[in-house]
Amino acid sequence: VNSPSGARGQLDYLDQAGLELLRATERGQLVQGVWVYKHPLDSDGLAAFHQRVGAGLLGRLIERSPLPFARPHWVTREGPQVDIITAEHPRPPAELMDWADELATRPIDPEFGPGWLLAVQPLTDGTTAVSFVVSHCLVDGGGAIVAVWDAILGNRRDFGYLPPRSRGRIAAAASDLRATVREVPNLVKGLSAVARVAARGVTSARKSGAAPPDPAGDDATVVIIPSAVAIVDSETWDARAAALGGNNFSLAAGYAARVAEHLGRTRASDGSVSLILAGSGRTGLDDDRALAMTFATAVIDPSGVTQDLTAIRNAARAARAKVATEPDASLGLLPLVPWFPQPMAKAFASEMFAYDDAPPVSCSNMGDLPDDIARVDGTT
């Protein structure tokens, strides 16, 4: 098991930060996949997938330490956590994304469960949709693909996690206290990062003005954010990217920048877009981190991306290189997140996405996926 944090089963700093920010902000991030089958669904095959996918990266939940400042651990929770949710009545294909959005409002929790769910929706044109929804605190996009792929192929990964509540409170507290003492050097480094981040925060606040109101407030309601789905033939996509002097990734980034421009999410100073490029930091199939991710910020001029992708390709490459040599100072605060009171945790979340005078725009690209990823019911 690759646990960069050290101890087996202990959450990585970024994973723990994700959990703490979930609790502080009450905004849960999810990963969702949708498949549409044009032929009859193999119900037995999907049931077998449902049994197998609840292993490895998805066969777990988070268990808190008895000590409020100590790091949580992964514990086993293998097998389905809820039954497959099968709709009784078909819906029009035009409502496919409405259905997907509705699934995302169901209770999903990485600590108390269920951490993930699987659902089926017949459509009135004879096709059938399948959706898989999982807490982002359990896996990122790359981890979800690994989990789904393993379940389809019948692979099983054992990360050696303990059963829930198996350590005993006294033994767990003693073990976690020793682990916390060993992490004192990391805490000291975190404290040294506070001044750097505070200075940057003052600068960002001056540029961006007052913080936007918290959309949750005291009377939080579910807000469905508008979305759109486009299906483009991969050969057409690659050909267009090549014609513009780019590649599959830079065309996606250019498209995101152009959409951002249309939505008015540009910098007031020069009309450029602050594009957050999410990348995978996963070191292999046995890397058990939930959030094995890297984030690079590229400043993009959206006006020329429809003629030439060279600039955006170079900007993205430079942004990723900078992340490798100059890590974001905010990441140095991760060891301190468990010690933050909730208001400070919320401020930390805002600081992580403070980008001068521009609202951030995210762009994720999972790349080319294996053909097997389409066979959640065992058929193609």
Residue ranges, per PLM feature:
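Soluble acyl-CoA-dependent acyltransferase catalytic core bearing the H(X)4D motif
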Residues: N2-Q10, V34-D44, A48-A55, G59, ...
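N-terminal alpha-helical "arm" segments
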Residues: N2-T25
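TRNA-binding/sensing appendages of the translation machinery
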Residues: T25-V31
